[in-house]
Amino acid sequence: MSWRVAGLVIAALALVKPARAQGWVVEPDGYRTEDYRSPVPETLAGARVLTTAEAEAIWRAKSGVFIDVLPRAPKPKGLPPNTVWRDKPRQDIPGSIWLPDTGYGILAGATESYLRQGLARASGGNMQALLVIYCLSDCWMSWNAAKRTLAYGYSDVAWYPEGTDGWARANLPVADAQPEPRPDDEK
């Protein structure tokens, strides 16, 4: 091998290593099923990937529906009557619909139904409605949920990978959130 070719190979390898060090992640074929809080890809095939400025423009124009998929620990069933249970507070992008637990890689039938029904309500049944899916930064939950939304046939899906972390860093408003009720919620 000539010195020139060897030099080019070394230079190419030097460029690849920093990309990995910066957290560059390959978009998987399926859904992510572990390490949900870790670096995410820069892409999602079929979806628009939004910056904070782009998400803000959509929010201010009210041209899309924002869907938060951050998980939430459920209240354990069968707690003694006097047990105090406090849900962890969630602040999300004002006007969002919160569909917790819908970003896992594998969804139980009831959770998948909850997501489908939530998307149908959010979109008004319009499969072309702009749906902006988010969670936190470096959160695969939003990536999975956006990918699943595309698989359900929605055609205008945007993924906001910075989520409420990026939103708050930009000093944009947040609001106290409550999840959309599930059919099996205690009354």
Question: Can you annotate each of these PLM segments?
Answer:
Residues 55, 65-70:
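Short hydrophobic beta-strand that contains or immediately precedes a catalytic carboxylate
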Residues 69-73, 78:
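Surface-exposed acidic loop/strand-edge motifs in secreted or periplasmic proteins
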Residues 6-17:
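Bacterial N-terminal signal peptides
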